[in-house]
């Protein structure tokens, strides 16, 4: 059965993952990544633009489907070898700001969990964010019922 997940990662790191077709969460730990199975969906939430920066973003920034079976190590530097999973990212038209997501009935349950870095969500919540991210700007709110 397909599961849906959120990963909390800076936008800068999300963009690297999208460009490279991979995901990393929780500072490169393997355990959270191995909770996901091939065919599961990952939705990235980015609280900030850069991991060590102060500029807030607070938006969902990418989503994609896991395409492999297990986490694998990847040497980024001599001293940092994080684990990754391969992901086929979907095309999006825009980020989904947190103000939009706050209107979803499950938001309160998930908001407090964002600090954990990786957790399972419902398909309904995933589809809500996905629809916003893939809708043309003039369609959002009018025909999708967002506001």
Which role fits each region the language model picked out?
Residues 46-52:
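Short, charged beta-turn/beta-strand-edge "cap" motif at the junction between a beta-strand
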Residues 56-124:
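Aromatic- and Lys/Arg-enriched surface recognition patch
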Residues 8, 45-46:
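Short His-Asn-centered micro-motif
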Residues 1-38, 108, 133-147:
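Compositionally biased, charged N-terminal/linker segments
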Residues 12, 50, 72:
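Surface-exposed, flexible loop/turn segments at secondary-structure boundaries
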Residues 33-36, 54-58:
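Short, conserved, surface-exposed binding loops centered on an aromatic residue
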């Amino acid at each position: 059965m397909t599961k849906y997940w959120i990963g909390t990662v800076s936008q800068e790191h999300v963009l690297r993952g999208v460009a490279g077709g991979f995901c990393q969460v929780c500072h490169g730990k393997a355990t959270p990544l191995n909770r996901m199975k091939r065919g599961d969906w990952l939705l990235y939430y980015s609280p900030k633009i850069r991991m060590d920066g102060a500029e807030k973003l607070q938006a969902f920034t990418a989503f994609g489907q896991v395409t492999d079976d297990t986490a694998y190590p990847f040497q980024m530097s001599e001293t940092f070898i994080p684990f990754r999973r391969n992901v086929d990212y979907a095309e999006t038209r825009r980020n989904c700001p947190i103000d939009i997501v706050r209107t979803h009935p499950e938001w309160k349950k998930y908001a407090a969990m964002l600090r954990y870095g990786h957790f399972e969500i419902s398909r309904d919540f995933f589809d809500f964010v996905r629809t916003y991210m893939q809708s043309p700007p003039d369609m959002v709110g009018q025909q999708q019922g967002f506001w």
